[in-house]
Amino acid sequence: METAAAVFILAALGLVGAQTVAAARFRARILGLAARLHDTPAMRSLEGRLPSLVADFARRAGVEPGAGLRLASFAQDGELRLRKGGRFTRTVAWQVVALGRAGFLWDARQSLGPVQHLRVVDAYVGAEGVLEARLFGSVPVARMSGRDLALGEAFRYLAELPWAPDAILGNPELAWRVTGPDRVEVRLATQGGTARVTFRFDAAGDIVGMEASGRPARDAAGMNATLDWRGTFADYRQIGPRRLPEYGEVGYVWPGTGYEPYFRGRIRDYHVAP
């Protein structure tokens, strides 16, 4: 009996040790992605190339052309559901966004009580997409890569530009085109195709809506698909050094049932850095 108990204890300790090592390696990988974003070029001064509606939005946010910044970062409190019709789960995240080249890192955690049960990393670094989820930060449960994922992450980078106004003025990879009195399209070329997002501005010149067609996604059965994508921004206020929309929501337009959000949240603790 004592021998069996000792074997059980040793096995448990070994499992805990393996999980600790795996979690440490995952954390190191996340920090490595953040370091690669820090090595991207600083933002440039491109105000003269932009539609006035876009340039005015960035300047009103507090962006200073030629400031030489590389990164924006912020914390996020939100709700996320992982499948169509699923329940929302509280999610906290830390996000870093490159300003002079397309790139971001989203490091999110979902918890059950005091225990973190899922850690999700969603990123676009070096023109490649990364999507990985781990139970307890150590046990892999999902991992994706490839050209479709990279294109989908490029869509996300564009859609979240209202939270990175310095990139609007300073990223030369972005191409802008006015498509209506209150609408502007922004494009980003990738190896898997061109990501296109259209922003809708209100009468005050703030971005309040986002829409895109053909974003790579998974359908309700988990199969590869392309879907229309929608988002909203609201509650503009000063957050750190920038005037930004505190609230954001995004979801897919599902055939037959229409729009369904899968993420909604608020940002805080906003910073920019060279």
Predicted regions located by residue number:
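N-terminal membrane-anchoring alpha-helices
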Residues: 1-40
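Flexible, processing/modification-adjacent segments and terminal tails
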Residues: 132-190, 221
